């Protein structure tokens, strides 16, 4: 579903937003069509095949991890699904055209797409979940109380 929503929004942006900017919240949120051959914030521009290889390796690792059932809890699986769906959405663009379509613009920050949102929030929530899932690991463990030694034994 993530891949479908991502690809649909990219299709709609390409069909309706080329050369246009639609302001949704002045100064904060716009829809604006651009293409990007890099990653978030236009980093590593022109590295199409690096991203293709990195995504293919990521997908292979995810398949291995899922087969091994290392992630067993629902929150972990939802986060992995979000990251993977976003990665596949951008992977499709890179394979087919070499460019990723971005359309969600925060004027003072960046322009990105639905896949980027799922990758970012999936990764963020996964880190938060991992850091908070076992509160005993983060909390100070109570010190063991010494038992009085029985001198009569």
Task: Please describe what each predicted stretch is.
Residues 1-153:
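Alpha-helical transmembrane bundles and membrane-interface segments of multipass inner-membrane proteins
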């Amino acid at each position: 579903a993530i891949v479908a929503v991502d690809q649909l929004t990219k299709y709609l942006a390409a069909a309706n937003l080329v050369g246009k900017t639609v302001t949704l919240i002045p100064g904060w949120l716009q829809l604006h069509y651009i293409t990007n051959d890099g990653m978030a914030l236009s980093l590593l521009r022109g590295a199409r095949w690096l991203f293709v290889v990195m995504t293919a390796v990521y997908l292979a690792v995810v398949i291995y991890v899922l087969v091994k059932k290392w992630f067993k809890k629902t929150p972990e699986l939802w986060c992995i699904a979000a990251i993977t769906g976003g990665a596949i959405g951008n992977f499709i663009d890179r394979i087919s055209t070499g460019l990723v379509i971005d359309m969600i613009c925060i004027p003072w920050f960046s322009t990105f797409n639905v896949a980027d949102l799922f990758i970012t929030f999936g990764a963020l929530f996964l880190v938060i979940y991992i850091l908070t899932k076992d509160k005993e690991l983060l909390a100070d463990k109570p010190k063991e109380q010494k038992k009085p030694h029985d001198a009569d034994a």
